[in-house]
C-alpha cells in the first residue's frame, strides 16, 4: 500500500457482534441477583483501504449496554476519522464521557485497541514494535478463580507448577480466617521455591488486611492485591505504611492515568495495575505505565478476562520496562473464546509475543457467528 494512501485512510465501517459464552464465573455471593452471563462483544473497524482493526469488549452483565454505548456514543466520534488520530479521538471520548455519557470502566478501551491494530497493520509491524519494543517475552503467573474449598486452590497451584509456571495468584474465597488457612496451606504444598500472590478482591477491613499482610510477609508472598475497593485511598495509605509487603492496587481505579496519579500522590500503592480493557485502551495503559515509571513503580498489567485482549496486554507489556509478569487467567479454556488457538506459553512458563502485523492472532468467526445474539453495523455516510 502506498504511503500516501495509508496516511489518508479513514474508518469506513464499525461492526459489533454480541456473543454468548454460556459461562458464569462468579459464585452467588459475588454475582448477586442480576444476570451474570460472561458474554463478549466483538468489535471490528474497517478502513476505506480494507484494513481491519479487531478488539473484544466485556458484555458480562448486559451485552445491550456495551453494544449501545459503542454504536450510539462511540461510533459517531470514530466514523470517517483517520486511525492515526488516536490521541485526538481518545481525548474526544473523554470529553463526551464527562458530558453525560459516563462510560463503564471497560469502555472506550476496545475502540482504542482496534485503532492501534489498524495502524500497526498499516505499518507492517507487530503491535509491540509499533509501540516501541523493549522485549519479546515475559514470565507468566497462573491466576485462578474463586474456589469453595482449600484443596481446589492447592490442586490448581500444583497443576500449574507441574506445567513449568513459577508463580500462582490465589483469589481466596473468604472470610479472612479461611483465607489465612489457604495462604498457609498453599505455601506448605508448593514449597519455598515457588512464588505466590494473593488477591482477595476488595473483601477486607483495614485491620484484616494488616493481619493478612503480616502473614503473607512471613510466608514470602510476592504481593497483596486489592484488599479494599480501589477508591478507599485512606485505607490503602495506612496499609502501605504498616507493611513491608508490596501492595498492588488501581485495577478498577476510574479516570485512567489521572486517577492513578492520585493514588501515587497519596502513597496508596506500591504497584499499580492497568489493562487495555479497563484503562481506556492501549493509549491509557501506556500513559499509566509511563506515569508509574516516573515514580520508580511497576505497572503490572492486569488480565482482561479475554485471551484476545490479553494478547494486546502482552504487546503493551513488551513495550514498557516496568512490568515483570503476564497474568495468565486459568483455566484457560474459560477465557480463550472467541480467539483461535491458545496463549503462546512454553514449558518454562514464558509467554512470547506474536510477530505478525498488528495484534497478530485471529478470532474464530464461525464460533462468533454461531453464538451471536445481536449484530450491528454502521457505515460512514460520506464514504
Language-model segments: residues:
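Structured beta-strand/loop patches that form or line metal/cofactor-binding pockets in enzymes
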Residues: 2-54, 58-59, 331-337
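A cross-domain feature marking catalytic cores of carbohydrate-active enzymes
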Residues: 57, 142-144, 170-172, 198-202, ...
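Shared catalytic-loop signature of beta/alpha-barrel
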Residues: 214, 220, 231-350
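Metal- or metallocofactor-binding catalytic centers and their adjacent structured scaffolds
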Residues: 14, 46-122
